[in-house]
Amino acid sequence: VSCNVDGMPSWNALIQNMAKAIDYSRCDTCRHRLESCENTCLLKDDFSTDELLKVPQHVFNKDQELYYRILNESIPAVTADAPLSSAIFDINPAHIITTNYDQLLESSKNIFCEQYQVIVYDKDLLNADKGKYIIKMHGDLSDASSIVLKEQDYLDYSQKHVLIELFIKSLLTDHIVLFLGYSLNDYNIKLILSWLNYMRSQNGAFDVDRRVGYLILDQE
């Protein structure tokens, strides 16, 4: 969703910025490599799902200051009243779950935005005083340490975000869910959906009518 706003990078673009900082590409192992192709080849940044996690982890392990600087430089502090954000609030969903780090949703001028409370940490759920949430399950750029991007962040997610993960699982269990612009390659999303399918299969829920989910993706 954020990619529809000028200056906001995609997940791949953010990892490409980190890869360039440590001179990492797929060229050294590419079987299509030619001496003259390195600067124009589109395959050099065609990272696997595994690399999308390991590249930021390598940057962090090598230089934490560089890691956080790339994050802050790659994701601008934009608080635009994005039309798509406003359209989401017009639907008036029970809750909004986002993997984006920016503040485009909560900065919307849509009148319904005021009904929602931002949730970044487990403690935010415990202290919430509103009935609707914007759950930023991968953190917020205002606190770079909260961001879930590198491999270790994903490995530690279930331990560090116990309440948020449980809450998301409960929403997927008894709500109709609209996935808008999500990458179903996201490690957290795949794990949660896998858990949900397992629970349904173990309890015979596939044999009865159940709530459905909808997925909208950009074909590009």
What residues fall within each predicted segment?
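Conserved catalytic-core helix/loop/strand module for nucleotide-ribose chemistry
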Residues: 1-176, 184-220
